[in-house]
Amino acid sequence: MLNTFAAVVRRWHTDNLCHWKENHTGRIMRYLETDFFPLIEETPIAELRVRDIKAVIDSVAARGVVKTAEKIRQWINSICNYATMLEIIDGNPAAPLAGYLKKTDTAHMPTLPREELTGFYRRLLLADTEPQHRIGIMLLMLVFARNKELCGAQWCEFDLKQKQWLIPAERMKRPRAHLVPLADWTMELLAELLIITGHGDFLFPSRTATGGYISENTFGKIINGMGYKGIATSHGFRSLASSSVLNEQGFDENAIERQLAHVEDNKIKAAYNRAEYWPHRVAFMQWYAGYLRGHYEQARTLNGEVTDKAT
C-alpha cells in the first residue's frame, strides 16, 4: 500500500484519538483537509519536502491567522515524527520549520486602504470566480467576522427574521458565542446566496470535501488574484472597518471592540453578555454597510453594470 500523506495522517489521527477531546480531533482533520490535503493529499509522504510544508504554512499565515498556521505546522511535525517512528520515512521534513512563524506572530496583516474601496469592488465584480465566493468576500467586509468564522458558517446559525447571526462558541477564537447584527445590504446578499447554496448546511460548501465547507484559503486566493497580494488580506477588512472608518466617525469604541469579539478574559470570565452595546452595534453596522455600498455602486457604474445583484 502506498503511504500517501493522507493515508499516514488518518493512521496517525486514529492512533491518537484516545488522547484528544472530541472537538479537538475534529478540528485537526478539518484544518488538514481544507488547507493541506488539496495540495498534497496523494503525495507519498516520503516525497514531502520542507518547501511543500512551508508553502502551506505561508498560505495560511497570509490570511492573518498566524496562530492557526503554527498549529498546523505542529500537527504536520507530529505526523512526520510518527511516520519516522514507523520507518515510513527516514527523517522529518517539518523539523527545520520549528520557530519559523515566531518572527511574524505579531505582524499586522495588510489592510486595504479605504481610498481603494471602489477599485477593489470594481476588480471583484470583474474577477473570474464563482458567484457565491464573490458574495462571500462582500459579506466578509460587512460582518467583521474572522475568515474561518464565515467560511464555516451554517444556515442554521442565521435568524433572518431578527436579522442576526449567532456564531457558536466552538467556532470562535475564544470559546464564547458571538452575535452579529445583519445590515440591510447584508440581508440582500444573504438572500442571493440562499438561492445558490441554501439547499445545504453551509453557506460556502466545499466541492471536494463531502459535507464540508470551502478552504479558508479561498477568499485570500481570490483577493491575491485580483492583484492585491501584499496589499490587502481577508483579515484586514476588520482593521479597515474599526481603525480606518468607524473610530473616525465617532462610534462608541467599546461597542466596536465588542463587535470585533475583542473581549478581555480578565473582565468577562464569570458572565458574558453577547448583546452588550447592541443598539450601538446595530447602528454602526448599518451605517458601515451604507458606506461600503456607496463604493460598490460607484464600481458598478464604472464597470457599466446594469444589475443590482452581486452575481
What does each of the following model-derived ranges do?
Residues 5, 9, 21-24, 28, ...:
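Hydrophobic (often cysteine-bearing) scaffold residues that line and stabilize catalytic clefts
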Residues 1-63, 79-82:
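Basic/aromatic-enriched alpha-helical hairpins
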Residues 103, 111, 166-175, 187, ...:
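Catalytic-site neighborhood detector that most strongly recognizes the C-terminal catalytic loop/helix
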Residues 113-118, 162, 181-230, 240-241, ...:
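Active-site/catalytic core of tyrosine-dependent DNA strand-transfer enzymes
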Residues 85, 138, 142-149, 218, ...:
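C-terminal catalytic core of tyrosine-transesterase DNA break-rejoin enzymes
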Residues 301-309:
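Short hydrophobic short-linear motifs embedded
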Residues 60-75, 85, 89-152, 161, ...:
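Basic, Lys/Arg- and aromatic-enriched nucleic-acid-binding interface segment
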